[in-house]
């Protein structure tokens, strides 16, 4: 079975659009883009477009790649103080000379639509869902629930330990909550016996950023696989590149119970949860 993200995301977005249309004012989302990374520019454009479609007023703030930390922090502080802005997103990755941790921590936790501020991450770890959940982990759970993939008591293996996906997803999936409550194993590229461990997993989340890393010999026939990876690889086509996931899709798709495609799997869910968090921020302010 293919776990396509678009229908699941559209269901969420349609609900948000209906709720926002009944609001006396519109939520405001500020997206900060630093530099000229082509992929980041595409992603920001997609987010701004989707926000506009459902009634969120969204504006991209573009800064040059040589921007100083001070100038970025000044912009974020201005957005923190702006009552018309309910959510702030800083598009990652940042230019190497900028400290992403310092910048993300400068965002008000109440406007942290990415859910990456230490306050929101801390609430997640403590099992407090009053905070804003990181978009990709939350989107993965919503996607699995949409396709009625049972999670309670299942063994979930997460390959990757980033602050954006791996760590918060592990914290989310292990929570004693009706939608999660998994037994979680966190792995990475240097983990010993990785193939053997993956074969015991009911659910595999691939979030390494290593194209085609997960092979068909690593998965059990009953496994549900969520591929978070999106690596641009040069290709002889109109775009000049193709997107590859962390899973060797063509060989794995016939060896597992269900799998997300790349693109069209996790990506739409991440955007949907970003919009959901923005609406939630607006409601909290109102």
Swiss-Prot record:
GO CC annotation: cytosol
EC assignment: 1.5.1.5, 3.5.4.9
Binding site for NADP(+): 160-162, 189, 230
Residues that span the membrane, as ranges: none
Pfam families named among the record's database cross-references: THF_DHG_CYH, THF_DHG_CYH_C
Pathway assignment: One-carbon metabolism; tetrahydrofolate interconversion
One Gene Ontology molecular-function label: methylenetetrahydrofolate dehydrogenase (NADP+) activity
Reactions catalysed according to its record: (6R)-5,10-methylene-5,6,7,8-tetrahydrofolate + NADP(+) = (6R)-5,10-methenyltetrahydrofolate + NADPH; (6R)-5,10-methenyltetrahydrofolate + H2O = (6R)-10-formyltetrahydrofolate + H(+)
GO biological process, one term: tetrahydrofolate interconversion
Annotated keywords: Amino-acid biosynthesis, Histidine biosynthesis, Hydrolase, Methionine biosynthesis, Multifunctional enzyme, NADP, One-carbon metabolism, Oxidoreductase, Purine biosynthesis
Coiled-coil residues: none
Function: Catalyzes the oxidation of 5,10-methylenetetrahydrofolate to 5,10-methenyltetrahydrofolate and then the hydrolysis of 5,10-methenyltetrahydrofolate to 10-formyltetrahydrofolate.
Subunit relationships: Homodimer.
Annotated family: Belongs to the tetrahydrofolate dehydrogenase/cyclohydrolase family.
Protein name (database record): Bifunctional protein FolD
Lineage, broadest ranks: Bacteria, Pseudomonadati, Chlamydiota, Chlamydiia, Chlamydiales
């Amino acid at each position: 079975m293919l776990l396509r993200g678009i229908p699941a995301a559209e269901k969420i977005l349609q609900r948000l659009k209906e709720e926002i249309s009944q609001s006396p004012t519109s939520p405001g989302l500020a997206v900060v883009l630093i530099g000229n990374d082509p992929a980041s520019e595409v992603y920001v454009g997609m987010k701004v477009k989707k926000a506009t479609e459902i009634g969120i007023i969204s504006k991209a703030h573009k800064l040059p790649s040589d921007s100083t930390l001070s100038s970025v922090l000044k912009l974020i502080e201005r957005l923190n103080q702006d009552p018309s802005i309910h959510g702030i997103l800083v598009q990652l990755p940042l230019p190497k000379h900028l400290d992403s941790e310092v910048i993300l921590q400068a965002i008000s936790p109440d406007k942290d639509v990415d859910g990456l501020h230490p306050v929101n991450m801390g609430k997640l770890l403590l099992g407090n869902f009053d905070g804003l959940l990181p978009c990709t982990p939350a989107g993965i759970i919503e996607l699995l629930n949409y396709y009625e993939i049972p999670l309670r008591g299942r063994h979930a293996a997460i390959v990757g330990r980033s602050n954006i996906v791996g760590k918060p997803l592990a914290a989310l999936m292990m929570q004693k909550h009706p939608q999660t409550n998994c037994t979680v194993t966190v792995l990475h590229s240097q983990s010993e016996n990785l193939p053997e461990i993956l074969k015991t997993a009911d659910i595999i989340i691939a979030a390494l950023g290593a194209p085609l890393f997960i092979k068909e010999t690593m998965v059990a026939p009953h496994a549900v696989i969520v591929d978070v990876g999106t690596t641009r690889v040069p290709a002889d086509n109109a775009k000049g590149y193709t997107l590859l996931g962390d899973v060797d899709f063509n060989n794995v798709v016939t060896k597992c119970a269900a799998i997300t495609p790349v693109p069209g799997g996790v990506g739409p869910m991440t955007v949907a949860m970003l919009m959901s968090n923005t609406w939630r921020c607006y409601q909290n302010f109102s």
